[in-house]
Amino acid sequence: MTATVKDELSRLRVAKPCCRRAEMAALLRFGGGLHIVGGRIVVEAELDTGATARRLRREVAEVFGFPSTVAVLAAGGLRRSVRYIVRVERDGEQLARSTGLLDQRGRPVRGLPPQVVTGSACDAAAAWRGAFLAHGSLTEPGRSCSLEVTSPGPEAALALVGAARRLGVQAKSRDVRGVDRVVIRDGDAIGALLTKIGAHDSLMAWEERRMRREVRATANRLANFDDANLRRSARAAVAAGARVQAAMRILGDDAPEHLLAAGRLRLEHAQASLEELGALADPPLTKDAVAGRIRRLLALADKRANALGIPNTEASVSPDLLENA
């Protein structure tokens, strides 16, 4: 999934100058750094895809007006894959100052530039886009799904955690064998971040794989069911879970809290009956009350989807989904 996300982000067109600057600042910060060559400051970034290297060169030229060079390092030895080295030599110091890699006194900035750290939500999203393009990875959805960015240091990692917080996404900074990483493990949080940074097609593919894994897990449990009624109930639970998950994605936080709470209960206890869900609610509810709230949540989401011209919750229940159940 990492290559898929990076390919999509590399093709994303961004119009706002502040966002383009924030993305480039993060891409250079997480992808490389500053070097002194012959008494001059050289800005360098080492990247793992040619598309990202081309994007960096184009943006440096269009936004900042500086030329750059690219060198290709073939795979071999300790390098498992081709690497692309983008360098700005003649105008390195000017680029470093323009992107905030150097402060006003000419000292290296260890985290992210102040204009990115204190910027708007779009700047935070752009910084995450640049950081992911530089050193991000996304694992296949499953029990241990994660989105990670390798950081050049703890200051940059904490700045990225703060940027995620401004986007409403919880990320954590961790030191793994001496390497600073920013990690997001919650599936819904990963989906929210992919949306924020503009990886919409990748999100759909990731969510589809995530749903298939959940369906397979349910199918494995169904293999031990002898009672046909239990099978029908399980299929209904899969369908209900898929529709509620779609409703939560469509509505976000824009729905009455008691309806969202019922939806969360359904997702957190996928195999529970309505009566069991009612007992788990706080305060407890009857099964009819739980069913009514979930129905209203789905209706609200379908109405919103129709208004926006996007697939409604019914579209999430495909024949393949039920057949695999």
UniProtKB/Swiss-Prot annotation:
The family this protein is said to belong to: Belongs to the WhiA family.
NCBIfam families: DNA_bind_WhiA
Record flagged with keyword DNA-binding: yes
InterPro entries in UniProt: Homing_endonucl (IPR027434), Sporu_reg_WhiA_N_dom (IPR018478), Sporulation_regulator_WhiA (IPR003802), Sporulation_regulator_WhiA_C (IPR023054), WhiA_LAGLIDADG_dom (IPR039518)
Segments of the chain annotated as binding DNA: 273-306
Biological process, per Gene Ontology: cell division; regulation of sporulation
Key words, A-Z: Cell cycle, Cell division, DNA-binding
One Gene Ontology molecular-function label: DNA binding
HAMAP family documented for this protein: HTH_type_WhiA
Organism of derivation: Frankia alni (strain DSM 45986 / CECT 9034 / ACN14a)
Domain of life: Bacteria
Protein name, entry field: Probable cell division protein WhiA
PANTHER family: CELL DIVISION PROTEIN WHIA-RELATED
Functional description taken from the UniProt entry: Involved in cell division and chromosome segregation.
